[in-house]
Amino acid sequence: MSSPEQPIVENLNLPEFNRRDGDKMALGHTPSTRSAELVAGARAALMNTKETVALSSTSGRVVARFLSDIDGKTQVLWFFPARMMVMEHLTPKLIPADKSELLLVDIASGFSPRALHMAQKYPHAEVVEVDLPDVVAEKKKRLTKGRIEIPGNLRWVEADLGKTPLRDALDGRQADLITSEGLSLYLTHDEYVRLFNNVEDTLLPGGHFMIEMYFKNKLQELRKSPNINGVASFVFRMVGHVPGILPDQSSASKYFTQVGMTDITEYVVADVMGEIGQKKPVDLISIMTARKPLTKAATPPPAEPPADAAPADSQP
């Protein structure tokens, strides 16, 4: 998948953030590391719970507070905690209420406490986080340092899902629910295809997949508000190359349908936050859910890369 948001970012008069001379904000040298630390810092700064603070770094909290001061009332950074809150709100709708044994899998969890919360809320379920070995090691270290009790039904699997099929990482087991938060921004078209094939193969019949998605048509709305425009653009500049922004919602739906998934539903994070009585973030993100049918239908033709995509090696 190429980077459809590039023309937007090019026209925004972005603040200069030169990373060539090193990690100037101590968030990490790679886009995924910077993103994980910034998101963890935003959750800690804006939610300020024992778990979010424990899972964040000092530099992540400092940068998040700095951006929060710039952000003011635009609520750009609030969409980081909001997407987690909406996914937690939707989870009960996606798992069988009467099943005694459940397998809930979160992939590329980063420093999110969401799987920890799932393990606490669903003690009859086995909750598995799948992530890179260094991320798992650092997360365990932070939880221990923060004296966060780890439920007995939560465990970690160390795997690079770019090399290891998800089902192999789970020793052939299939899940009732697979979730992904914070990964989609970094996926190319081929990586999206691989992810959805992996998820379909690893879900039990009747199981659900939940993932957050970003859309070019929503980002274009930022240009109408200079304040939101500037803050959001700075955030995206910090996290680096983000090829996974899709042109629109129909582009996202094709990834589900190509693997035969049904009941595809979009939940606009800002709208759901309003419905549950929480502060609404700026409308940048949606949560998409879908179901693996009980019987497999004929597979549709493979999804094609979006027609208006920019070159895959482009940078924001």
Can you describe what each PLM-predicted range is?
Residues 2-105, 109-157, 173:
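Rossmann-like AdoMet
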Residues 193-205:
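A short glycine-rich, Lys/Arg-flanked "PGG" loop and its adjoining helix->strand segment in the class I
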Residues 223-246:
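Conserved Class I S-adenosyl-L-methionine
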Residues 275-306, 316:
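Core SAM-dependent methyltransferase catalytic element
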